[in-house]
Amino acid sequence: MESGKSPLEENLQEFTLKEDSELRFEVANGDVMLELVDGRAEVFGTELIQHKKYVFPAGSRVAVFTWKKAVVELVGKTESAYVAEQTPMIIYLNTHAALEQLREHAESVVMQQEQARGPSLMIVGPTDVGKTTVCRILCNYAVRVGRTPIFVDLDVGQGSISVPGTVGALYIEKTADVVEGFDKKAPLVYHFGNLSPGSNIPLYDLLVKQLAEAISKRRKSSQDATYGGVIINTCGWVKGEGYACLVNAAEEFEVDVVIVLDHERLYNELQRDLPSFVKILHQPKSGGVENRSKEVRISSRNAFVHKYFYGTRAMPLYPHTFELSFDEVQFCKIGCERLPIECLPFGMKVDDHRTKVVPIEPSEDLVHHLVSLSMCTAVDQSVLTTNVMGFIVITAVDMEREKLTVLSPQPYPLPSKILILSEVTFIDDKERT
């Protein structure tokens, strides 16, 4: 005899959360719907609205936290779902309060001190300690007290502002959507073209410097940005050259505060190597953070690129596929083969080959590669330090007809003819008519 319940209703779970506790759940296959039935609660710093239904797709990992108490319902199949009574949220709230004090101090001394500005905070730590989540919480808390912080993501492998292989910044004017995250309508994005800083450290350091300078100009031109401060996410590579990249980023962004998540050695090394005026804090990671396998990381990157072109079920996008003639575009890449010292042009440094912009000819090797659309009008060194306007994927190359087929967020023609090759690939498996 049938129960008469839908498959979703068969999987209904209700949780009563005590003060300072959180419900942690991971979505299995299919969707899970979250509803706040009673009380007050938040997801990564964004408040939930009572009786609004939030639908999370497969693979989502979510923490629903309450400062007082709450009753929440989950409908759908979860991989896991449990209530944790020990969380680091009070630590993150205290961090937010300290940052807000620094913002208020900057406002109060602006009449006497022209250089007063809100805090620049950098969050560091190895992979899988929850750096991106802490950034999201602190940005959301800042917005909830009327601030407009700038969020910077220097993680080229698992970034949350744009597609993999980029660094970028986002002006945060409203709290993140509970399911979709921050509004990414107008990010400032630079092309790196690889998934690890180690593939081209001179280029990575140069882009960090460029991004820091662009943000400094933005802060000088806007009072809200000046006082709102900067919150910086970083890569999980914390040893050797990766550590040097972190120190360089701290210097370029002139950070005031560094939070080290769950890594005592890194905390001690930064205490030794950063200026004494930088406040360095060691904080625990959340117990809800789990180590991600290589396969999960690859899947996460592919999902991010897929979302860029296709959106989500709640907010779908409809990309375009069309052909381009070879002569309609100019391809280039950053970095070339190292020449022997005796063959270098006069004045060129040995490292310069890593940051040289070189034109390339279309070939079948381009298939499945992401390509950045530069705002430049010619292939020259300005491509290196100019932000990009968007991305396409090369889905086919016909050498006989001299035609490319591309997946693009907008219809023909492309807004730029200067295309920068990325080593990041994406296989578009959607069939469109």
Swiss-Prot record:
Main location, first listed in the record: nucleus
Origin species: Brugia malayi
HAMAP family: Clp1
Primary role: Required for endonucleolytic cleavage during polyadenylation-dependent pre-mRNA 3'-end formation.
Cytoplasm keyword on record: no
Domain of life of the native organism: Eukaryota
Pfam families: Clp1 (PF06807), CLP1_N (PF16573), CLP1_P (PF16575)
UniProt binding sites for ATP: 22, 61, 128-133
The family this protein is said to belong to: Belongs to the Clp1 family. Clp1 subfamily.
InterPro entries: Clp1, Clp1/Grc3, Clp1_C, Clp1_C_sf, Clp1_N, Clp1_N_sf, CLP1_P, P-loop_NTPase
Descriptive protein name: Protein CLP1 homolog
Localization in the cell: Nucleus
GO term, biological process aspect, one: tRNA splicing, via endonucleolytic cleavage and ligation
GO cellular component: mRNA cleavage factor complex
Keywords: ATP-binding, mRNA processing, Nucleotide-binding, Nucleus
MF-aspect GO terms: ATP binding; ATP-dependent polyribonucleotide 5'-hydroxyl-kinase activity
